[in-house]
Amino acid sequence: MSTILIFIAALLACSLLAIWRFRVKSRRGSLPWISAFQDAQTRKLLPEERSAVENYLDNLSQIQQVPGPTGASAAPISLTLNAESNSVVILTHSITRYGITTDDPNKWRYYLDSVEVHLPPFWEQYINDENNVELILTDTLPLVISLNGHTLQEYMQESRGYALQNTASTQASIRGEESEQIELLNIRQETHEEYALSRPAGLREALLIVASFLLFFFCLITPDVFVPWMIGGAILLLAAGLWGLFAPPSKSALREIHCLRGTPRRWGLFGENNQEQINNISLGIIDLIYPAHWQPYITQDLGQQTDIDIYLDRHVARQGRFLSLHDEVKNFPLQHWLRSTVIAIGSLLVLFMLLFWIPLDMPIKFTLSWMKGAQTIEATTVKQLEKAGVRVGDTLHLSGKGMCNIHSGATWSGQSNSPFMPFDCSQIIWNDAPALPLPESDLVNKAMALSQAVNRQLHPKPEDDSRVSASLRSAIQKSGMVLLDDFGDIVLKTADLCAAEDECVRLKNALVNLGNSKDWNALVKRANAGKLDGVNVLLRPVSAESLENLVTTSTAPFISRETARAAQSLNSPAPGGFLIASDEGSELVDQTWPSTPLYDYPAQEQWSAFQRLAQTLMQTPFSAEGIVTSVYTDANGTQHISLHRIPDKSGWWRYLGTTLLMLAMIVSAVYNGIQAFRRYQRHRTRMADIQEYYESCLNPRLTVSPENLI
């Protein structure tokens, strides 16, 4: 439900954003030439302003009817107000002026970037580098109604009847009419190569791509509910980065270049010329700004009529036959090594995060098996599995009867807290060999016999046979004493169990004291000779409890040792067969867990608990399914097969995504690392190569062959 709500909210937000963008574009579409000025503002035209504009247009129309010096009237400029003239556009921009050959006294044309505007000629003296301009739209050209605080209202009030004439410029950026005329040959858009010089180096796009890599990584460790949104965001970031790097520029992004013809001349430092330029060269009234590396070559065209392409900001894009920014980029492409470095570093960062935070073994194996087209195997017998030919990546569905594996201490790899210890039921030995018999132990039998003998004499039951009469036993019990009515049997069973000298030392000393013997060997000889038959020993309750504890502690090591030895004796399966293991440690049997782990039992109960466990797990039903992650055969001929649980659909996609992301990061790091190194080397020599190219074009060297010298 939360996913649906998030989706609906995101869809609603996108719809509102799209509606807002559409309304903004439609509002700007009503004035199509406004799109050239992104920072323009608009307001309504006031009635008094409209009246001043109409008066100015009437005066302009009358002036255009006056014949010029040659007797011809100026070509009429149709400036007629329309419905869109009620909107005033306010902007701050530079004004570019071009001269034309005409009899019209107002022979200048004015441009705001690529938009030609009509500027009242009496305002030419107020033109600055940056101008506060207010425009309205007419049927032909936008009309300037205010320039740097000067309005048509002021003009009509203060200079009514003033003749429209060209006012000589007093600003240093505009030279007088005596300046040489330049010819405007063409207005074109800059080429893609010329645009590349002003285009950013792509650092922002590289950061977007790295951010998309990081989002792809976090998709692997976030909950499934957020994964689609994060993948969508990562794809959008990646697409935005790639689009910014490789998409061709839009037509609106390409600046206009004016193709001029004139005679460039060097002028002294004056007025508004750029003081940072080494060479101060002008074309007519236009102060040219050259690329710094062109300085050695531009003097060849001085004083000669030359074709020059310039931007509206007076930067030169081409001059003469050879100097050309377009040819530079075409023959010596720009080397953006920094963006390749950023992408390579970002790829390495994500790769290290994958190596240290995400287990890669299973994703790689699953992806490779999926690409190879692994098979699905179902088997209920050992022979069926042998015929199938198991390979890594296969999917297995197995069921049958087998034995839970027992590990030796040196090779223990199962769960340390396995409920079936010492059996590991996450590994099943499956073969056709007969089941092993239940383990037996003489030492355990002897220890149990000793414990039972002492327990029977210390805690007699009425139905037990006794060498002492019932009345005497009752009298002894009433007195608070404890009677051992067969002391010799205890000595013999102790000697049978503890044959070594260093075994049961404390128990032997206690029995020697009770038997009033010189040492243990003498006591055993007396017992073997039958001299202890019929000997009764009276014990205080404290002494009886101490004797019972001594027997318990003396027999415990024997039983524990024999239990461990018996478990290891089962760790010898028949040759051949299979060992099916879950690499996640999952139990492969459906057995009830023991209420108490084996080694939590008292030593005297461990043996019987182990036998019950062995009887259950030495031939138990099992079922195993999963994907094969490893297959090998040991020296005993047993084939070891490791299984990993079959992932769900989400798990499959995560494994596949992990592998693909790792491969993509490796390829990206290697490719962009190499590209960064190569581009950096070329970037260092690019300017020298360009200058060498210009030297060869402008100052060619003639090579004379030896044959011509003869």
Curated annotation (Swiss-Prot):
Membrane topology qualifier: Multi-pass membrane protein
Topology, Cytoplasmic side: 23-204, 247-339, 678-710
Compartments, record wording: Cell inner membrane
Coiled-coil parts of chain: none
Record key words, sorted: Cell inner membrane, Cell membrane, Growth regulation, Membrane, Transmembrane, Transmembrane helix, Virulence
Any Pfam family the entry gives: IgaA
GO cellular component: plasma membrane
Main location: membrane
Job description of the protein: Involved in negative control of bacterial proliferation within fibroblasts.
Family according to the record: Belongs to the IgaA family.
Protein name: Intracellular growth attenuator protein IgaA
Gene that this polypeptide is encoded by: igaA
